[in-house]
């Protein structure tokens, strides 16, 4: 289910697992956060690599997940390098075949 894929996504992100993340992404995925905007799978993967290379560790704690059809609203606490905590809301949309087509991240 897409709900399980959301949990996998945050696990793979916390583990900096580019290959597994790539498997979840649609070819035409878009990613927008407070620093970057990327379109298509290769560019989104590169954006993730850049994030992972800029930190020693990154850990995603899920506070709450709500869903409406193929869209998930995820309240998160992201801990960088074991100490810096950021409140984030991700809005993640899936396509009809269960691939992530859009990620929008908002910093709280």
Question: In which residue ranges do the predicted regions lie?
Answer:
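Short, low-complexity N-terminal intrinsically disordered segments enriched in polar/charged residues
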Residues: 1-19, 23
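Short acidic/polar mixed-charge low-complexity motifs
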Residues: 37, 82-86, 99
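Short, surface-exposed coil-to-beta transition loops
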Residues: 58-60, 84-90
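Short beta-strand segments that buttress and anchor functional surface loops
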Residues: 73-81
């Amino acid at each position: 289910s897409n709900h399980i894929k959301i949990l996998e996504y945050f696990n793979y992100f916390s583990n900096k697992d580019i290959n597994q993340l790539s498997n979840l992404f649609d070819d035409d995925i878009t990613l927008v956060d407070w620093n970057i905007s990327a379109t298509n799978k290769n560019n989104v993967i590169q954006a993730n690599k850049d994030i992972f290379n800029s930190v020693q560790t990154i850990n995603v704690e899920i506070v709450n997940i709500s869903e409406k059809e193929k869209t998930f609203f995820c309240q998160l606490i992201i801990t960088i390098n074991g100490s810096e905590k950021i409140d984030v809301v991700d809005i993640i949309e899936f396509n009809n075949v269960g691939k992530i087509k859009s990620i929008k991240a908002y910093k709280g």
